[in-house]
């Protein structure tokens, strides 16, 4: 008697790459899903240990929250669901593995803090014990493990010259199971959901809108106003938070800048 093996579940773990286009791990997962019929689980974890790190503040997590809401709207329109869980990563993946032993995890390689480095070491050990493949894609041209910089510039230029990835999100292989997630505590969710008009809003759409306005007209007096705390507010790109949290890719900005001349 032949026992059927359930299809492998591909987990796309979003961290500081909160966008749905020019996203290599997501593009890979969707391509595999289309080719082999594997379901795809988009995932973001609000990790209490990471949130408590002094490098972060509530304004960072509010930006993340807004970015996730924008992603959720787009995914739901395509029949998918972004699974957002309030969990330490090891605890979540232990629970997921117990329910779905056949998984693959794809993400960007995070260049972050000591706490994320330690988290990644624990996760690698967990995945190795369960013979789970965790594929980490290089992020923003960062080249890990190289012993010299002689070819760094050439490789970076090659990466930036590659076409930005456009992913068709309308396919039938999204995995949706909200029972796997722990809801963000109500008091935290309420604070993060509270708008703050004095801060830049998170989201892929806002990043591209800001880039377009900079390339169209705001750049005109950049060289004059860069040193002025008041004037630089409008003359600078103001893309820092969008690049930091991955609402837009470095390649998208680089190519848009080159196209604008």
Locate predicted features:
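A short helix-to-beta-strand connector/capping loop
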Residues: 76-81, 130-132
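Short alpha-helical segments and helix-capping/turn motifs at coil-helix boundaries
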Residues: 22-28, 92, 119-122, 260
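Catalytic cores of enzymes that engage adenine nucleotides and/or redox cofactors via long glycine-rich
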Residues: 162-261
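Short catalytic/ligand-binding loop motif for oxyanion handling, primarily in non-cytosolic enzymes
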Residues: 20, 50-51, 113-116, 143-146, ...
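N-terminal beta-strand-loop-alpha-helix module at the start
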Residues: 1-79
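Beta-rich, aromatic/charged-enriched effector core domains that present basic-aromatic interfaces
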Residues: 88-207
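Short beta->alpha junction loops
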Residues: 80-89
